[in-house]
Amino acid sequence: MIVGSGDIGLIMARRMTLEGAKVRVVAELLPFSGGLKRNIVQCLDDFGIPLKLRTTVIEIHGKERIQGVTLAQVDEEGKPILATQEFVSCDTLLLSVGLIPENEVTIEMGIHMERATGGARVNESLETNLPGVFACGNVLHVHDLVDYVSEEAA
């Protein structure tokens, strides 16, 4: 499950699929994808990955591990339309929502932060202080190319 349909989110959907993951859906809050048309075709359409526009995650399910998310469509103001709720089973939630480290969820989870980078503090395996919770990509620090994010996550 991926939130964000800019080029990085689209390319990560393809990369994760090529690595053996089943990407169930890419959700985008906006009424359009921020990615290039060719990336939508080559990264989603060619792999049968659905893109849901005007859609957001309203709930994350699971205790020790993520077990799924509840999605909902949003209205013109970006507020969830509760009558459109849909559960999506998944064991991973990838946030691809911009080039500035997005750490609101990281901080709320109690993950220690690295003062120098403004991102999550991790060990050599990219595991945070919470056992089983790993961080990579722009949640650690800004990357210039999605290839570097993929390399870091490997």
Can you annotate each of these PLM segments?
Residues M1-A154:
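Residues forming the flavin
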